């Protein structure tokens, strides 16, 4: 199969990644599942032709020397792709990631309405958290797109790699890719404030220094958006604090209580027909009560507060799962499998409401505690 046809098929099927490896058919990832494109496995010769055929002379020389090469290609009438070429078992291969030009809309992704409000926030730190492949980049792109269309200013995005290409609309959008436009996140962030930003997006917080920059940007009156690998809001706060030595924890809790705007946690769950996935969103908003708990380091109390604060735009994963199950968007089994507390979610479903269910559950727990005493 011709390489260009593989790229076109990937776009037509809505694939996110294309895998080219000797010994298996060319495969693409669609809705989180890797599916073969053809029945025939690629030979080492075919794989080499695909890999080297996508490179220019400079890239081939780099690949021959280091056995690694990252670059971008454009296919006319098809799209742009980020390529990561490599060797495995002495044979070459590559993975291509489709670079999105069409920026998703918040409403199209069925994200909570509070996300629009957060996108227009003047200052503060907003963390998007979740495992790899849970749609954090897509939701962030929608959020930046909303800001870009509805305000004026300068958005600086530092990513590794760039997954969505934003056009200049209401805002000037500066997108810098680590390894191509800048040496590292730290080097780029060091110079960011000199570039007069209004919004700063940090593709991923991996180090203490990057986390320090995130808080600093919020402190200096900027809106900082960043992603972090964590399963939920509580775990995100625990991960942030673990970047720092114990003697700094009290100061970090104070800094977060003052500068954190929100934590948005995300999962993706298959739809019942298996043809798509639904985003499940947990939202922690830094209200005065939340700020007080964070300042004290009492993260374990946040979940209960979130469950009772729907009017502030907050919701827990279990409440979001209940809503998706109630509207028929996910199955009962998948809802329970992804719940923070399967027992709490079962009770919500049995009672037939998320908010009232949470209050009744809290009351039930209080009664049980009294009986235990």
Name the predicted role of every residue range.
Residues 1-373:
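Short, flexible helix-loop junctions that flank or precede catalytic/ligand sites
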């Amino acid at each position: 199969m011709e390489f260009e046809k593989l790229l076109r098929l990937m776009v037509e099927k809505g694939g996110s990644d294309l895998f080219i490896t000797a010994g298996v058919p060319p495969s693409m990832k669609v809705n989180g599942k890797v599916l073969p494109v053809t029945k025939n496995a690629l030979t080492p010769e075919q794989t080499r032709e695909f890999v080297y055929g996508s490179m220019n002379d400079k890239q081939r020389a780099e690949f021959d020397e280091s056995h690694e090469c990252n670059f971008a290609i454009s296919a006319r009438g098809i799209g742009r792709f980020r390529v990561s070429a490599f060797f495995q078992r002495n044979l070459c291969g590559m993975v291509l990631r489709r670079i999105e030009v069409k920026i998703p809309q918040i409403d199209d992704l069925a994200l909570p309405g509070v996300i629009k409000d957060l996108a227009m926030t003047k200052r503060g730190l907003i963390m998007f958290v979740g495992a790899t492949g849970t749609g954090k980049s897509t939701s962030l792109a929608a959020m930046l797109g909303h800001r870009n269309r509805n305000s004026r200013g300068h958005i600086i995005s530092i990513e590794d790699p760039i997954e969505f290409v934003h056009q200049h609309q209401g805002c000037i959008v500066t997108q810098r890719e680590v390894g191509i436009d800048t040496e590292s996140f730290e080097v780029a962030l060091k110079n960011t404030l000199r570039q007069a930003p209004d919004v700063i997006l940090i593709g991923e917080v991996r180090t203490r220094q990057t986390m320090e920059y995130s808080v600093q940007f919020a402190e200096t009156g900027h809106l900082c958006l960043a992603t972090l690998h964590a399963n939920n809001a509580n775990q995100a706060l625990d991960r942030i604090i673990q970047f720092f030595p114990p003697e700094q924890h009290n100061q970090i809790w104070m800094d977060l209580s003052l500068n954190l705007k929100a934590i948005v946690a995300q999962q993706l769950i298959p739809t019942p027909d298996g043809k798509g996935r639904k985003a499940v969103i947990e939202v922690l908003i830094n209200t005065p009560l939340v700020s007080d708990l964070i300042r004290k380091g009492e993260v374990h109390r946040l979940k209960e507060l979130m469950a009772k604060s729907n009017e502030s735009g907050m919701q827990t994963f279990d409440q979001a799962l209940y809503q998706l199950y109630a509207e028929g968007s996910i199955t009962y089994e998948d809802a329970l499998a992804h719940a923070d507390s399967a027992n709490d979610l079962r009770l919500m479903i049995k009672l037939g409401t998320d908010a009232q269910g949470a209050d009744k559950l809290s009351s039930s727990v209080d009664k049980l505690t009294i009986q235990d005493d």
